[in-house]
From Swiss-Prot:
GO CC terms, sorted: cytosol; nucleus
PTM annotation, UniProt: Phosphorylation by MTOR inhibits SERBP1 and relieves ribosome hibernation.
Name of the protein in question: SERPINE1 mRNA-binding protein 1
Lineage of producing organism: Eukaryota, Metazoa, Chordata, Craniata, Vertebrata
Function: Ribosome-binding protein that promotes ribosome hibernation, a process during which ribosomes are stabilized in an inactive state and preserved from proteasomal degradation. Acts via its association with EEF2/eEF2 factor, sequestering EEF2/eEF2 at the A-site of the ribosome and promoting ribosome stabilization and storage in an inactive state. May also play a role in the regulation of mRNA stability: binds to the 3'-most 134 nt of the SERPINE1/PAI1 mRNA, a region which confers cyclic nucleotide regulation of message decay. Seems to play a role in PML-nuclear bodies formation.
SMART domains per the UniProt record, alphabetical: HABP4_PAI-RBP1
Source species: Oryctolagus cuniculus
């Protein structure tokens, strides 16, 4: 009916790829099932009906375990796969039926737990088991070592553990860091807390009797001075030095006063101590400004200038000399000669006949600017026309007759 809207409509659509997405099973399980079928076919030909039933049971357990493991595998395990040296079960071992050993009469040995996991298709580590660490054997205790702290070198090199990469620290073949030295002692007898230097003075200080020094005696790199430097800075040491210096001065004065044949009287130590205390009790010496200036003037070196006296070192042959003055007549004659020389005129000179008036001359050159025309039309007038227009005099601005329109 015209004008009536159709309420519903449809069209037939056939999608050839619609059935591909219907399967919700895991593709790994499908592949595993295909492999199990091949195993069953191979096992039936070799071992008979008993072997076939055992193969079916093993295949069923394998498929179930693989399905569970694949379902439980998290996204984190997929992002961080195992290293390549960790292998998966070889295909030869998978395809080989487990019952084939019975036919040949060989007794089957029970599997270890890792081999059982291997049969179930689980990823395992194919590396051999780690050996237990060797026992550390020491030839002698520390007390029995020789004098001077020297360690014995009689032990062969083979017994020593491998140091560095691949050592006993983290198993064979791995990136080990050698044997740990956290206990402060290894098989070769080195001590962790010893200081090592170029001369080995500090490392064997406990055995050789050398004293350990915190400072290097003022030599070498990283020099911190000597131990005596701190003693010299102490106040007790300074007091002792002052007392020694005072005693030396007293003895030197006594030796100068006494003749050579006489013996020197021995000074008592108590008197020396009293003198040192008196020197300390005096304190700083005070003086006035005038006294201080007098002392400074005495110590100051006087500067002497070698000033030449008048007529010192004069030559006697010039004593009769006198000053010569020019006469006035010679000067007047010289002036006349100079004037004649500069103002002499030639016979054909006509400069005196010329009359030059600077005020009457008009402005030559540019002249009138007429003849330009309108804006944009025509240019400047020719150079030749300027000479004609320059002859016409300019009108007088003050003359009212020159401008009749303004009157």
């Amino acid at each position: 009916m015209p004008g009536h809207l159709q309420e519903g409509f449809g069209c037939v659509v056939t999608n050839r790829f619609d059935q591909l997405f219907d399967d919700e099973s895991d593709p790994f399980e499908v592949l595993k099932a295909a492999e199990n079928k091949k195993k069953e076919a191979g096992g039936g030909g070799v071992g008979g009906p008993g072997a076939k039933s055992a193969a079916q049971a093993a295949a069923q357990t394998n498929s179930n375990a693989a399905g569970k493991q694949l379902r439980k595998e998290s996204q984190k395990d997929r992002k961080n796969p195992l290293p390549p040296n960790v292998g998966v079960v070889d295909k030869k071992e998978e395809t080989q039926p487990p019952v084939a050993l019975k036919k040949e009469g060989i007794r089957r040995v029970g599997r270890r737990p890792d081999q059982q996991l291997q049969g179930e298709g689980k990823i395992i580590d194919r590396r051999p088991e780690r050996r237990p660490p060797r026992e550390r054997r020491f030839e002698k205790p520390l007390e029995e070592k020789g004098e001077g702290g020297e360690f014995s070198v009689d032990r062969p090199i083979i017994d020593r553990p491998i140091r560095g990469r691949g050592g006993l620290g983290r198993g064979r073949g791995g990136r080990g860091r050698g044997m740990g030295r956290g206990d402060g002692f290894d098989s070769r007898g080195k001590r962790e807390f010893d200081r090592h230097s170029g001369s080995d003075r500090s490392s064997f200080s406990h055995y050789s009797g050398l004293k350990h020094e915190d400072k290097r005696g003022g030599s070498g790199s990283h020099n911190w001075g000597t131990v005596k430097d701190e003693l010299t800075e102490s106040p007790k040491y300074i007091q002792k030095q002052i007392s020694y210096n005072c005693s030396d001065l007293d003895q030197s004065n006594v030796t100068e006063e006494t003749p050579e044949g006489e013996e020197h009287p021995v000074a008592d130590t108590e008197n020396k101590e009293n003198e040192v205390e008196e020197v300390k009790e005096e304190g700083p010496k005070e003086m006035t400004l005038d006294e201080w200036k007098a002392i400074q003037n005495k110590d100051r070196a006087k500067v002497e200038f070698n000033i030449r006296k008048p007529n010192e070192g004069a030559d006697g042959q010039w004593k009769k000399g006198f000053v010569l003055h020019k006469s006035k007549s010679e000067e007047a004659h010289a002036e006349d000669s100079v004037m004649d020389h500069h103002f002499r005129k030639p016979a054909n000179d006509i400069t005196s006949q010329l009359e030059i008036n600077f005020g009457d001359l008009g402005r030559p050159g540019r002249g009138g600017r007429g003849g330009r025309g309108g804006r944009g039309r025509g240019g400047r007038p020719n150079r030749g026309s300027r000479t004609d227009k320059s002859s016409a005099s300019a009108p007088d601005v003050d003359d009212p007759e020159a401008f009749p329109a303004l009157a």
